[in-house]
């Protein structure tokens, strides 16, 4: 998460989640089974009740095969499927396509041409969710790179 001072930022240390995952699951076995099945990456989804902002964690190092997405569920709320999709897609390379992660011009371009793009927000109605060509390309689901992608690729997300 970007703003630690925000009231939406979770006070729970990210490493706590990683430790809990390692305690609850045989991560080495998960990696082995996934790789044997021909998977490039595995994702773990955590739903935590409480205040916070949903986010994805990219593991680095020896176990970079595993990625985690943490999703906060406020008490008695309905979690939208788009939040799950949005956070999970980060683990496979998708970028946030909203401000401040993108310029206002880029956000407006996506809103105009791909209004259902899930990386704009995970809070859109499920039936309207879609993936833009940029998101498909970032995740490696297509090799077709369009010229307009250049405006979205930054030093931080290369």
Feature-to-residue mapping (PLM):
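Extracellular/periplasmic catalytic domains that process cell-envelope and extracellular macromolecules
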Residues: 35-40, 61-65, 83, 110-113
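Catalytic zinc-binding patch centered on the HExxH motif and its immediate surroundings
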Residues: 49-67, 108-109
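Short pre-active-site segment immediately N-terminal to the catalytic Zn-binding motif
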Residues: 66-85
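Short, well-ordered secondary-structure micro-motifs within conserved domains or adaptor modules
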Residues: 38-53
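Solvent-exposed loop/turn segments at secondary-structure junctions
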Residues: 49-54, 76-79, 97-99, 124-126
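Active-site recognition of the HExxH zinc-binding catalytic motif
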Residues: 82-97
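Propeptide-to-catalytic entry region of secreted or membrane-anchored zinc metalloproteases
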Residues: 1-38
């Amino acid at each position: 998460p970007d703003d630690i001072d925000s009231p939406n930022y979770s006070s729970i240390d990210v490493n706590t989640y990683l430790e809990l995952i390692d305690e609850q699951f045989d991560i080495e076995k998960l990696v082995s089974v996934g790789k044997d099945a021909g998977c490039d990456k595995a994702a773990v989804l955590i739903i935590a009740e409480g205040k916070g902002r949903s986010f994805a964690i990219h593991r680095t190092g020896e176990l970079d095969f595993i990625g985690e997405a943490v999703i906060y569920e406020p008490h008695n709320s309905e979690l939208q499927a788009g939040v799950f999709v949005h956070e999970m897609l980060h683990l496979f390379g998708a970028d946030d396509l909203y401000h401040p992660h993108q310029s206002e011009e880029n956000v407006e371009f996506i809103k105009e041409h791909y209004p259902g793009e899930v990386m704009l927000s995970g809070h859109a109605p499920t039936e309207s969710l879609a993936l833009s060509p940029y998101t498909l390309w970032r995740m490696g689901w297509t090799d077709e790179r369009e010229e307009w992608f250049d405006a979205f690729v930054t030093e931080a997300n290369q």
